[in-house]
């Protein structure tokens, strides 16, 4: 009985957050319209860049909450199909195109020409989160590279940046829920949820993810998309 009550309360809380997320999308859309109006009237306004970046971050946080809530019933939401990896990559890059321009970050990406068996929507979220982190921790004028490499005898998608890197003592914990590490403490804006969600999603899809990094040189995120056993837990 206690478990049943806890489950009901948990569902009520999830429903509340879900409603909140959908409702907050309306003022965010209105802010986009207002910001566009300001830009039309005064395109040289120095604060425009910062306003755009902060609004984009707000959208990402809302999307992260929505994904976190959907994780509860992810198993019933998975739809595996053969899909072009380039299609997913291009959609993800397009979403962040404004950030690449605003931060003057170069993208080194050539079509990988691979078909993968995956859930397009969930894999796209994972790639978006990795790009978001790369942009967040790469200085203006830096570079992000997307390519294929063979690791552990398997072909992997690699998303690499030449940003600030991750401290060696933090690397084993980057996928822990709520862990922000040195970079997160310095940045004071990290939620410690993005990479946690990536790992959970990749595990449930039977894919693999791991990270190599060196402070001052950058970070490489590896996605092994050959499907292992599906894990619905």
Can you name each region flagged by the protein language model?
Residues 99-109:
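Short conserved segments within the C-terminal catalytic ATPase subdomain
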Residues 134-135:
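Short helix-loop "hinge" at the ATP-lid/N-box region of the Bergerat-fold HATPase_c
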Residues 141-153:
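Short beta-strand/loop element within the Bergerat-fold HATPase_c
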Residues 161:
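Acidic ATP/Mg2+-coordinating residue in the GHKL
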Residues 166-179:
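Short conserved segment of the HATPase_c
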Residues 194, 198:
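Short alpha-helical Gxxx[C/S/T] motif in the catalytic ATP-binding
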């Amino acid at each position: 009985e206690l478990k049943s009550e806890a489950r009901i309360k948990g569902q009520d809380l999830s429903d509340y957050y879900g409603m909140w997320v959908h409702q907050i999308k309306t003022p965010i859309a209105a802010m986009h319209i207002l910001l566009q109006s300001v830009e039309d009237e005064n395109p040289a306004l120095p604060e425009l860049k910062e306003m755009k970046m902060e609004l984009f971050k707000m959208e990402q946080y809302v999307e992260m909450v929505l994904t976190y809530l959907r994780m509860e019933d992810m198993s019933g939401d998975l739809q595996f199909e053969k899909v072009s990896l380039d299609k997913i990559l291009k959609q993800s890059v397009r979403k962040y195109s404004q950030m690449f321009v605003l931060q003057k970050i170069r993208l080194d990406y050539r079509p990988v020409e691979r078909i993968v068996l995956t859930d397009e929507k969930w894999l796209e979220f994972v790639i978006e989160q990795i790009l978001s982190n790369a942009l967040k921790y790469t200085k203006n004028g830096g570079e992000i590279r997307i390519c294929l490499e063979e690791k552990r005898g398997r072909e992997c998608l690699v998303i690499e940046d030449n940003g600030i890197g991750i401290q060696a003592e933090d690397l084993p914990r980057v996928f822990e829920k709520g862990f922000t590490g040195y970079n997160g403490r310095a940045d004071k804006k990290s939620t410690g949820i993005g990479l946690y969600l990536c790992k959970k999603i990749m595990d449930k899809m039977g894919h693999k993810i791991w990270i190599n990094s060196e402070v001052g040189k950058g970070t490489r995120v590896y996605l092994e998309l050959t499907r292992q056993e599906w894990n619905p837990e």
